[in-house]
Amino acid sequence: MTKIALQQDRPLDAIVLGRAGVDLYAREANTDMADISGFNKFVGGSAANIAVAISKLGGKVGFIGCVADDAFGGYVRGYMTEQGINLDGMMTDNSGSRTSVAFTEMKPNDCTVLIYRNKASDLTLKPEQVDPAYIAQSKMLVVTGTALSESPSREATLIAMEHARRSNTVVVLDVDYRPYSWRTDVDASIYYGIAAGLSDIVIGNREEFDMMETVLAPGNTDDDATADRFLRANTQVVIVKAGELGSKVYCKDGHKFQQGIFRVEVKKPFGSGDSFAGGLIWTLVNGGELEDGVKHGSAAAAINVSGNSCTEAMPTKEVLFDFIETREQDL
């Protein structure tokens, strides 16, 4: 069994860096966007989702990001505060940017999502707004990759990772690749490559690793070869998610294992990755083993996709353990 070495004497379990915005979910299931009568409002964005996931499990979480000086920005701040998330690293931008908004259908697949990110406030985060002392208060820094897509957020993200390395804060990169945020895969692969080299743990699906290997290994689809390529520099663990096939986990010491999924009735195809990361990270910061973390993440992902939102469908510790116990009894 594998454990990740952490600085346990810190007030925060994890700080998550990236976007926090608003998700508007269709009220009607299995309905096309044009026919939806209305939407329900929730906080969303990959980084916010992960932060909420860890917090709902009982973790002490901080956040680095930026929202606009608008009503949606205030809503995001208020909700995250209610969830017990420390917002000392959350900035407010008043330059005319806007908190990002996503409209989505509620379908198990072929689900249309409309995302409004012109002049997105989360991408206005500046390097000088990242406090190394804040990062040094946390066991982990969790970076979501969309923060790398544009300056000055790109530089702020990379300097946050550098600060984390200097303070012995474990760095996790959740690739979170959104093609619409990048000019080309080549551009994306360059900056993701830099970020991966600064990370202790890299989490992505096969398509995301394909992007990261655009220059170094174009056309490679072999997970073992991918892991060998990324288990260099600082990286200790590579996790390749494969949807219904589960996850493959590779460690620098040569240990590797697989984790299957927990099958549920899927209501929506998104939120699973963020819930997976939350379950994994919460387990690791509490001294749990990597194998248990991946299992907890897989269960949390299943719970989330069977719910009606992302943040509100993140499980508590009790819900998570009850779900796993029930499923394992059924085997």
From Swiss-Prot:
Keywords: ATP-binding, Kinase, Nucleotide-binding, Transferase. Catalyzes the phosphorylation of 5-dehydro-2-deoxy-D-gluconate (2-deoxy-5-keto-D-gluconate or DKG) to 6-phospho-5-dehydro-2-deoxy-D-gluconate (DKGP). The gene is iolC. Pfam families: PfkB (PF00294). It catalyses: 5-dehydro-2-deoxy-D-gluconate + ATP = 6-phospho-5-dehydro-2-deoxy-D-gluconate + ADP + H(+). GO terms for biological process: inositol catabolic process. Its EC number is 2.7.1.92. Belongs to the carbohydrate kinase PfkB family. One of its GO terms (molecular function) is 5-dehydro-2-deoxygluconokinase activity. Pathway: Polyol metabolism; myo-inositol degradation into acetyl-CoA; acetyl-CoA from myo-inositol: step 5/7. It comes from Photobacterium profundum (strain SS9). Coiled coil: none annotated. InterPro entries: Carboh/pur_kinase_PfkB_CS, DKG_kinase_firmi, Myo_inos_IolC, Myo_inos_IolC-like_sf, PfkB_Carbo_kinase, PfkB_dom, Ribokinase-like. PANTHER family: 5-DEHYDRO-2-DEOXYGLUCONOKINASE, HEXOKINASE FAMILY MEMBER. Transmembrane segments: none annotated. This is 5-dehydro-2-deoxygluconokinase.
